[in-house]
């Protein structure tokens, strides 16, 4: 089934993916294209509506991103946001200029709305502004429909041509009733019906996969992460026993993670699963290696070798399943080419695996949509909402050289940490939390005796996408319980510290 489509035209704004997600939350399928996309390509997509994103440039400068005037002649409703309203105004003959110190607006701003179908049902008057330029004169045929004390054109429209623009950001949470404005644009102006749901996606995708793969064979590298897990179950729904999954257990997983993967996919979904216990092999390769990038490279390359060896035992495979999701496609060139994700985001495409074609069942989905699909498919919440885990696993959470002893210590400490977060009801509130084992020992006193044991670092952050993050303000009583349990229950640890570094300047992982 072909769904109604709204296009987001990206001018370099930081919220391009957020806008697309907001559209999809309205049950409308959405894709992102760069502002350099040709008019022919836009026409081929046959969109019901178009949204211009914000951007860091000034519309009146010659080298700034622009758009062909032809797009305004398509008869398709267009909504310009921030830079989007400015480039619309500039291209159509309005005047955009740099704002003076008083005219620059950042953060929550009081606004006065006029009559417009965009603002139907809006009862609040606070929006989120982030601009240094402003529209001094709107193009011919446009009407000003909102203003602030310092921004005379906070919104404009040309109803006859179905062109609309807002200077603020309705897509961000801080903009009161911004979701209503987007809904009004989609349903009142673009006249969409809202036919994009997880149910419809699953049904359409299974049908598509059956037609594409038929009775041929597919191979999937299963990590136990959300993306590869959902991809595997979706493919299995379509082709059943013609799917084989290889799960390379490199010995660098969290406590019980390998057993959980085996239980879920073998017992619950009855998927052909080959579990390869390669712990000794990986630890042998990592012996004495302490530099983070060297560890990453070793783990990535060794995974590829193990995967190739196991897949070659199976003979020819027609399809290789990849868990590529939509942000990967966007970041690789706005849909021109897909980023081929390797297992755990390490390594690359196996060179010696005999397959004809790659299949990416999730390439149209954002992460939150992948999770919804996973729940619809019956994958348990514990896996679907598990915190992000790096490809090299404990190999980069053990700081310095990696040994089995250190991995075992870290596994136990991390398990205690996660257990306490779940008991406190904080696990789902946190984007990512984990324990790390620095290559440091400290002096302590336990049972009236001097100890010299490892220090464990705790990390917890909040984020929407992992690009930036804030350290999580953990309640002191929870921290105290976690620290006491780790020191009392995990042999080889006598000190616990909590990392309060945001990103930037730090990264989320320590290595």
Curated annotation (Swiss-Prot):
Domain of life: Bacteria
Entry keywords, A to Z: ATP-binding, Glutamine amidotransferase, GMP biosynthesis, Ligase, Nucleotide-binding, Purine biosynthesis
Enzyme category, top tier: ligase
Record's GO cellular component terms: cytosol
Source organism of this protein record: Clostridioides difficile (strain 630) (Peptoclostridium difficile)
InterPro entries cross-referenced by the UniProt entry: Class_I_gatase-like, GATASE, GMP_synth_C, GMP_synth_GATase, GMP_synthase, GMPS_ATP_PPase_dom, NAD/GMP_synthase, Rossmann-like_a/b/a_fold
Binding site for ATP: 223-229
Reaction(s) this enzyme catalyzes, per UniProt: XMP + L-glutamine + ATP + H2O = GMP + L-glutamate + AMP + diphosphate + 2 H(+)
Residue ranges of every copy of the Glutamine amidotransferase type-1 domain listed in the record: 5-195
Subunit structure: Homodimer.
Taxonomic lineage: Bacteria, Bacillati, Bacillota, Clostridia, Peptostreptococcales
Pathway membership, UniProt: Purine metabolism; GMP biosynthesis; GMP from XMP (L-Gln route): step 1/1
Matches recorded under PANTHER family: GMP SYNTHASE [GLUTAMINE-HYDROLYZING], GMP SYNTHASE-RELATED
Protein name: GMP synthase [glutamine-hydrolyzing]
Molecular function in Gene Ontology: ATP binding; GMP synthase activity
E.C. designation(s): 6.3.5.2
Active-site residues per Swiss-Prot or TrEMBL entry: 82 (nucleophile), 169, 171
GMPS ATP-PPase domain ranges (all copies): 196-386
Function noted in UniProt: Catalyzes the synthesis of GMP from XMP.
């Amino acid at each position: 089934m072909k769904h109604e489509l709204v296009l987001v035209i990206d001018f370099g704004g930081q919220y391009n993916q957020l806008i697309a997600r907001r559209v999809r939350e309205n049950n409308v399928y959405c894709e992102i294209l760069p502002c350099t996309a040709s008019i022919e390509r836009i026409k081929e997509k046959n969109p019901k509506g178009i949204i211009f994103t914000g951007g860091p440039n000034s519309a009146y400068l010659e080298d700034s991103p622009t758009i062909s005037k032809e797009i305004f002649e398509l008869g398709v409703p267009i909504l310009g946001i921030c830079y989007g309203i400015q480039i619309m105004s500039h291209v159509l003959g309005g005047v955009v200029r740099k704002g003076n110190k008083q005219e620059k607006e950042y953060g929550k701003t009081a606004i006065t709305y006029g009559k417009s179908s965009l603002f139907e049902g809006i009862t609040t008057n606070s929006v989120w502004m982030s601009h240094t330029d402003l529209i001094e004169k709107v193009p011919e045929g446009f009407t000003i429909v909102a203003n602030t004390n310092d921004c005379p054109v906070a919104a404009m429209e040309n109803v006859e041509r179905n062109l609309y623009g807002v200077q603020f950001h309705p897509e961000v949470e801080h903009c009161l009733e911004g979701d209503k404005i987007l809904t009004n644009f989609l349903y009142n102006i673009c006249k969409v019906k809202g036919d994009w749901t997880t149910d419809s996606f699953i049904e359409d995708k299974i049908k598509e996969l059956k037609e594409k793969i038929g009775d041929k064979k597919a191979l999937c590298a299963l990590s136990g992460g959300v993306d590869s897990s959902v991809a595997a179950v979706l493919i299995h729904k379509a082709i059943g026993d013609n799917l084989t999954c290889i799960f390379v257990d490199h010995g660098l997983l969290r406590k019980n993670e390998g057993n959980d993967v085996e239980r879920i996919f073998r017992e619950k979904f009855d998927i052909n699963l080959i579990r390869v216990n390669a712990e000794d092999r990986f630890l042998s390769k990592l012996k004495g290696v302490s530099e983070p990038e060297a560890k990453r490279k070793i783990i990535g390359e060794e995974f590829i070798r193990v995967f190739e060896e196991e897949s070659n035992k199976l003979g020819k495979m027609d399809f290789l399943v990849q868990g590529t999701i939509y942000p990967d496609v966007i970041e690789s060139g706005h849909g021109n080419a897909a980023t081929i994700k390797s297992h755990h985001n390490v390594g690359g495409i196996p060179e010696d695996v005999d397959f004809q074609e790659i299949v990416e069942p999730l390439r149209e989905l954002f992460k939150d949509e992948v999770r919804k699909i996973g729940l619809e498919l019956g994958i348990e919440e514990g896996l679907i909402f598990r915190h992000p885990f790096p490809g090299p696993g404990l190999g980069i959470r053990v700081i310095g050289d990696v040994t089995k002893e250190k991995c075992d210590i870290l596994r136990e400490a991390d398990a205690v940490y996660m257990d306490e977060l779940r008991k406190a009801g904080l696990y789902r509130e946190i984007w990512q939390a984990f324990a790390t084992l620095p290559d440091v020992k400290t002096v302590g006193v336990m049972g009236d005796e001097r100890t010299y044991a490892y220090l464990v670092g705790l990390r917890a952050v909040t984020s929407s996408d992992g690009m930036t993050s804030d350290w999580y303000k953990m309640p002191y009583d929870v921290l105290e319980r976690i620290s006491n349990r780790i020191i009392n229950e995990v042999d080889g640890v006598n000190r616990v510290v909590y990392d309060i570094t945001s990103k930037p300047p730090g990264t989320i992982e320590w290595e």
